[in-house]
């Protein structure tokens, strides 16, 4: 795999999507940001949604509740647009509860064993919300917050900047944490997510986006035929609670191996519970520099998504437990109807000193970037530019 050469340039060609049939009409003259009122919480708080559009016809929608990605509309090789991220229809649907579709999760993405950690000699008790463990920031994590938002736009991108201040002690975490998440849709057909945070006390931070992807289009069926490559030759074995055992194990000779292209479902029957929910250790040569983490191809539509990140790990989740009670446009979702590639630090790092540190101290800045780059795979050739 080839690493990203720079913040705005991909090592692989991106599709000339605006030229495809059905995409040029209505495309913006340049990057644009439009704000809409999306709904209200039961307490009357307004929830807004921002629509980002580039000149090539791609469209991204983000709402302020949970800093949630609600749409990524990408054409297939015939120019037909589809929303490739799983979503719900109304603000009320999200508020009533959902499996974190497209939400920013924090303060700590993934699991912390025993809902506790010790930092600088002080033990902190977090809210247990996964049995006795803590997951995705607790019962009132960032996915249930209405974020402040403002549009950001340049000649090369359309974006929205979302901010939130998490008070000292929220869900048990020390320190007042100031967080900024920026989504930007670029003219190069990249969805760029930037995460920043600062604290006034030592704390742990691990942020990600929990988008579920289906490159055939949300609601179209399962993703087991998607072809996946992960730039990871090791993963973290875990116990039955999905808490890492502490070792970094080779994927070679196991159904965890996606170092070469293979369909997601090709060996899922050999995985415990027939479901991937595992953290992979990315093969990075340059520490936290932006590099390629994953490439996914949906053969029928020709859609390609590449994921670049500064993070050391990525959680692959194949959503076996997705309920058919959850619907979009009246169409029920179901098992394996989406996959997640959650770029992040490792689960339970606060209790594993050998894992990359997630400690953030006053005066330091937490900064990470993840990019999703979209293109079209020609039937007999590389992704078109």
Give short role names for the model-derived ranges.
Residues 1-4:
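N-terminal secretory signal peptides that target proteins for export/translocation
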Residues 8-19:
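Bacterial N-terminal signal peptides
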Residues 13, 22-27:
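Cleavable N-terminal signal peptides
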Residues 26-385:
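An exposed, glycine/acidic-rich loop-and-rim segment of catalytic or binding clefts
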């Amino acid at each position: 795999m080839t690493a990203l050469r720079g913040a705005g340039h991909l090592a692989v060609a991106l599709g000339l999507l605006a030229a495809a049939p059905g995409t040029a009409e209505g495309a913006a003259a340049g990057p644009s940001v439009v704000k809409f009122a999306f709904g209200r919480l039961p307490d009357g708080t307004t929830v807004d949604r921002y629509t980002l559009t580039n000149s090539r016809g791609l469209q991204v929608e983000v709402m302020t509740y949970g800093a949630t990605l609600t749409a990524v509309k990408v054409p297939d090789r015939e120019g037909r647009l589809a929303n490739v991220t799983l979503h719900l229809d109304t603000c009320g649907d999200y508020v009533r509860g959902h499996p974190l579709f497209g939400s920013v999760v924090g303060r700590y993405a993934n699991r912390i064993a025993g809902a506790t950690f010790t930092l600088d000699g002080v033990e902190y008790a977090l809210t247990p919300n996964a049995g006795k463990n803590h997951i995705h920031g607790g019962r009132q994590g960032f996915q249930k917050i209405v974020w402040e938002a403002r549009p950001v736009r340049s000649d090369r991108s359309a974006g929205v900047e979302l901010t939130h201040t998490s008070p000292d002690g929220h869900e048990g975490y020390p320190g007042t944490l100031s967080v900024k998440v920026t989504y930007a849709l670029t003219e190069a057909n990249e969805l760029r997510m930037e995460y920043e945070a600062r604290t006034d006390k030592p704390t742990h931070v691990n942020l990600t986006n929990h988008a579920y992807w289906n490159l055939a289009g949300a609601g179209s069926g399962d993703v087991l035929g998607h072809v996946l490559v992960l730039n990871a030759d090791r993963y973290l074995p875990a116990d039955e609670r999905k808490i890492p055992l502490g070792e970094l194990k080779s994927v070679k000779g196991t159904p965890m191996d996606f170092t070469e292209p293979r369909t997601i479902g090709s060996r899922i029957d050999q995985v415990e519970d027939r479901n991937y929910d595992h953290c992979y250790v990315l093969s990075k040569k340059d520490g936290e520099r932006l590099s390629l983490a994953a490439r996914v191809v949906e053969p029928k539509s020709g859609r390609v998504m590449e994921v670049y990140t500064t993070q050391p790990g990525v959680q692959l989740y194949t959503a076996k437990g997705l309920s058919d009670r959850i619907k979009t446009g009246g169409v029920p979702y179901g098992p394996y109807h989406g996959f997640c590639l959650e770029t992040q630090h490792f689960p339970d790092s606060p209790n594993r000193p050998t894992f990359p540190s997630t400690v953030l101290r006053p005066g330091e800045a937490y900064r990470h970037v993840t990019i999703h780059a979209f293109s079209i795979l020609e039937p007999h050739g590389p992704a078109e530019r």
